[in-house]
Amino acid sequence: MTGIDLNTVEEDEEEAAEEVAANGSSPAPARAGAVCLELWHACAGPVAPLPRKGGVVVYLPQGHLEHLGDAPAAAAAAAAVPPHVFCRVVDVTLLADAATDEVYAQLSLVPEKEEVARRADDGEGEDGDGMKQRFARMPHMFCKTLTASDTSTHGGFSVPRRAAEDCFPPLDYSQQRPSQELVAKDLHSTEWRFRHIYRGQPRRHLLTTGWSAFVNKKKLVSGDAVLFLRGDDGELRLGVRRAAQLKNGSAFPALYNQCSNLGTLANVAHAVATESVFNIYYNPRLSQSEFIVPYWKFMKSLSQPFSVGLRFKMRYESEDATERRYTGIITGSGDTDPMWHGSKWKCLLVRWDDDAEFRRPNRVSPWEIELTSSVSGSHLSTPHSKRLKPCLPHVNPEYMVPRGGGCPDFAESAQFHKVLQGQELLGFKSHGGTAAATSQPCEARHLQYIDERSCSSDASNSILGVPRLGDRAPLGNPGFSYHCSGFGESHRLQKVLQGQELFRPYRGTLVDASMGSNGFHQQDSPRAPGVVNKWQAQLHGRAAFHGPPALALPSQSSSPPSVLMFQQANSKMPRLEFGHGQLDKHENDRRVRFGPSEGIERREQRIPLQPYPTSGEVIDGQVTVEKSHSPGRHGKDGPDNKAVGTNSCKIFGISLTEKVPAREELDDGDANYSLQSLKQVPKSLGNSCATVHEQRPVVGRVIDISTMDMMI
């Protein structure tokens, strides 16, 4: 191995260049002192720290111990060495291994008192760093990681065009095959000759003759890096960076077998006690963190307010021997080893923003990083993948749930319609009868309801209707609640399952009521004040309203599961008339009256109960269905047609054996409707009808229950 004196680099280099030029084309060994300083730094890497001669540094024995591989003998002597040793640089000798061309340095240090070191460093600081000034004069250079074709015996070395034009002498492109001979010297001033040619399709710069000999001599493999450097004098130099050195992370056996007695902590402890000179062998590429730090840099890091949550950036050398900047966040701090209490060596715990490309340590030293900004504590969680996330709408915190204790826990977003298979052709009908693309906003909606987890499993306690979003219920009345039945979906969602594609989802309720001033009123529709007052007067003094009438789902085995029945005996609704409906001119039409028992105008309507209501869907009078007097309707589905309802096969209420006619839309003023296929009423229903009150005081609606073929 060879070494050079930093003070005599330029003179020795010029003398060696004259001698090497006369040796011919064969590689010739160079004498000591012929190593170029710029080439050494280029091989060491862009972030390799190296103090200048006469400078003041801080030596950290803990980092040196890690650099040596944690030798037991060195660990035993660590107790006599302080965690930080202030030193003055006596000499710097740049060395290179003859077998591997790996660079390292021998530093001669003498311990100093902190006060003496501070006075010696006054006026220097960052501007007085001689090594940074030398880097500013770095000549033209390019570095390339070798590929498999670059290391093959029959191939050559492909040089990027811009790099060839910047570092190599210019070619004569007027020739048919431009070429020239290049002469480059390595760290040991050994000359290597290559043929530089510009050829191929497309044309490119290649090093052919002499390249295979260089690869075999240096034992280069794919992944190693080769660099070419042209100085100010035009001389071309050649160096290598081995990728295996960064991966192994261990010291060179030849280096430390010869010099281990000079770099142990035992000698350091003796030198600190006697204030004598000690030598440190330092490989900048092997050390994951600096353990010899300039004094100004060390003191500057101590003045920085490092705390949890601060963001930082750090220069780091990747495997391709290029300098990169990585960012991260500080997650903690503390001593790495209790034996070195108070040591600043890797005292910061960090988390990198992206640690997939290159594995970096989770501990860094304060002088290695640069603070950028601070973040809140909520950003300390594990980072996620940068996938686009849907922007969910804000839910009103006043949108309360009874017995829920806060905002409803929607299983799905409240602002997105859920469409299942076969529902793509359906539209959504808003409260006003027009198609709406989205649900009404939840702001200013004060509703109380029971979500899907609170729905009763007892069919007799299930209520078909849920309120329209436009209606409000006083939050102060806990007895006024809405229950959902069916599939337990949120009432904000329009959901249709497979088989329900032929029917539009409805907005509204069968019994659309709200409570106010001990009376019923419709907030969305105009009404006469006299009628409302009369209605309130009739209810004055009576029991409080406990909820809309319940539509019981039958539990008898004789009743089909798709038939909906009205609850009679268990109904707690006051002032409701119960009676038997009478058949009209069509045997299959039965009617249910809605209305008060006295003093209020009645009006009868036929409202179809759709064969498959789902929870969260409501029924309104202004819907689009088939006219009741369509031609040929009773001829097919009339009472004389015995085949209907007996031999048919249905799934979710849809017949698989008969063709379902298309529906036509009626005007909003037409209130007569009929179902697609009329079926015979089961015996379990009898002639029982329930006259329940509608929310609208002057309107009575008649519901045909004999044709109901409902799905639970």
From Swiss-Prot:
GO MF, any single term: DNA binding
A GO CC term attached to the entry: nucleus
Location within or outside the cell: Nucleus
Entry annotated with the keyword DNA-binding: yes
Pfam families registered for this protein in UniProt: ARF_AD, B3
Gene Ontology biological-process entries: auxin-activated signaling pathway; regulation of DNA-templated transcription
Tissue expression per record: Expressed in roots, culms, leaves and young panicles.
Entry coiled-coil feature ranges: none
CDD domains: B3_DNA
Keywords annotated in UniProt: Auxin signaling pathway, DNA-binding, Nucleus, Transcription, Transcription regulation
Keyword field contains S-adenosyl-L-methionine: no
Residues annotated to bind DNA: 142-244
Source taxon at top rank: Eukaryota
Matches recorded under InterPro entries: ARF_dom (IPR010525), ARF_plant (IPR044835), B3_DNA-bd (IPR003340), DNA-bd_pseudobarrel_sf (IPR015300)
Family: Belongs to the ARF family.
Quaternary structure annotation from Swiss-Prot or TrEMBL: Homo and heterodimers.
Biological role stated in the UniProt entry: Auxin response factors (ARFs) are transcriptional factors that bind specifically to the DNA sequence 5'-TGTCTC-3' found in the auxin-responsive promoter elements (AuxREs).
Record protein name field: Auxin response factor 15
Gene source species: Oryza sativa subsp. japonica (Rice)
